[in-house]
């Protein structure tokens, strides 16, 4: 297993798919990384040389990934809450933020139903 950005990348998968196991790298970004390094996308990670893996690491370090990205997202949500915006209010109340209906749906966000006491 190759270790990139503190994550063990699966060797048996193609490079494009294997890179998506890093938080913050999806299919499009992994395709960009493969094109930037000159590594074919359908090459298995186990067949890459150490120098190719080093070039992958160099390109990946240019992006905000893993813990830094998670921290950035949490700080953005915290900033919305502190500013008192409508989106921050929805985050604070654990309700859908992007305008979805809540009368019948949104069970994932709201949690299990609470029984009405009589």
Swiss-Prot record:
GO BP terms: translation
Keyword tRNA-binding: yes
This protein's record includes keyword Flavoprotein: no
Cited Gene3D superfamilies: 1.10.8.50, 30s ribosomal protein s13, domain 2 (4.10.910.10)
InterPro entries: Rbsml_uS13_C (IPR027437), Ribosomal_uS13 (IPR001892), Ribosomal_uS13-like_H2TH (IPR010979), Ribosomal_uS13_bac-type (IPR019980), Ribosomal_uS13_CS (IPR018269)
One annotated Gene Ontology cellular component of this protein: small ribosomal subunit
Family designation: Belongs to the universal ribosomal protein uS13 family.
Subunit structure: Part of the 30S ribosomal subunit. Forms a loose heterodimer with protein S19. Forms two bridges to the 50S subunit in the 70S ribosome.
PANTHER family per the UniProt record, alphabetical: 30S RIBOSOMAL PROTEIN S13/40S RIBOSOMAL PROTEIN S18, SMALL RIBOSOMAL SUBUNIT PROTEIN US13M
Name of this chain's protein: Small ribosomal subunit protein uS13
The encoding gene: rpsM
């Amino acid at each position: 297993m190759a270790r990139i950005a503190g994550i063990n990348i699966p060797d048996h998968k193609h490079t494009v798919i294997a890179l998506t196991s890093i938080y913050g790298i999806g299919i499009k970004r992994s395709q960009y990384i493969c094109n930037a390094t000159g590594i074919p996308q359908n090459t298995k990670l186990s067949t890459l040389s150490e120098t190719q893996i080093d070039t992958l690491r160099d390109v990946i370090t240019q992006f905000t990934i893993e813990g830094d990205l998670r921290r950035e997202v949490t700080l953005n949500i915290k900033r919305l809450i502190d500013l008192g915006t409508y989106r921050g209010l929805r985050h604070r109340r654990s309700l859908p933020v992007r305008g979805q209906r809540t009368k019948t749906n949104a069970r994932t966000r709201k949690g299990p139903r609470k029984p009405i006491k009589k």
